[in-house]
A protein has these predicted regions:
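Short, T/G/N/S-enriched strand-turn elements that build extracellular solenoid repeat scaffolds
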Residues: 3-8, 24-30, 45-51, 66-72, ...
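Well-ordered beta-strand segments characteristic of repetitive beta-sheet solenoids
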Residues: 1, 8, 12-19, 33-40, ...
Length: 243
């Protein structure tokens, strides 16, 4: 129990291992060189802070980083959890950020890296009103991707999304300076949503609803829909050719 301004700090490598739960609500766990946490559950709500000047490895069954919780690493971050709750929380890495979970809830949350972000959610990734940014690349794999309510998926480099379904309505945005590749086995709902690429844009889906939505690219734009394509009030635009 490290609640309410509690402080666990190591000048070198900080290792916290417990078979039970780690309660860090409003507390701080700091590794000045490296931080490793293993627990059944980690409660980092209420402005709890886990930080490392080096790498950060977290492996838990349940991670609650909501309500202002912060996970901050200046180098690589590896996070494995069965369930990750980052609603109104922040996860920030200075180098590669690798997230693996069954369920990721990032509503109104912020997940970012100045390097590459790889996120895998085995059941669902909910980014409604949230932001996931990988400056050097963003790679997301999940059956169900929710990015409505002005959710943002962005990268200065390439952005790749592989899913069964993508819901990007209500001002949702996928943005990249290099290229966007969206591959969907099922539906793509882009009503009043946007995909904006300064490079290529490739979209494959079973069916596409782009009512009031925008698919635009400075490079080649390729849209493949096995079923219906509804573009009523929508826009498909490319500076380099449309197919």
């Amino acid at each position: 129990d490290n609640r309410q301004d509690g402080l666990l700090q190591s000048r070198d490598r900080a290792v916290v291992k417990t078979r039970g739960d780690l309660d860090n609500r409003g507390g701080q766990v700091v590794g000045l060189n490296e931080l490793q946490v293993q627990a059944a559950a980690l409660d980092n709500r209420s402005a709890g802070l886990l930080s490392s000047k080096g790498d950060m490895d977290i492996e838990v069954a349940r991670l609650d980083n909501s309500a202002g919780g912060k996970l901050v690493s200046e180098r690589r971050t590896l996070l494995k959890a069965d369930r990750l709750d980052n609603r109104s929380g922040r996860i920030v890495a200075g180098q590669d950020l690798d997230l693996s979970s069954r369920l990721i809830d990032n509503r109104a949350g912020d997940i970012s890296s100045t390097s590459r972000v790889v996120a895998s959610a085995r059941e669902q990734l909910d980014n409604r009103g949230g932001k996931i940014v990988g400056d050097s690349g963003l790679d997301i794999t999940t059956p169900r991707m929710l990015n409505q309510d002005k959710g943002v998926l962005a990268s200065r480099d390439g952005l790749r999304l592989s899913a069964t379904e993508l819901f990007n309505g209500g001002g949702g945005l996928l943005s990249s300076q290099k290229g966007i590749d969206v591959s969907l086995a099922g539906a793509f709902d882009n009503q009043a949503g946007s995909l904006d690429s300064r490079g290529f844009l490739t979209v494959k889906s079973a069916w596409l609803d782009n009512q009031g939505g925008t698919l635009s690219s400075a490079g080649a734009l390729a849209v493949t829909s096995q079923g219906a394509l509804n573009n009523q009030g929508g826009r498909l635009a490319s500076d380099a050719g449309l197919s």
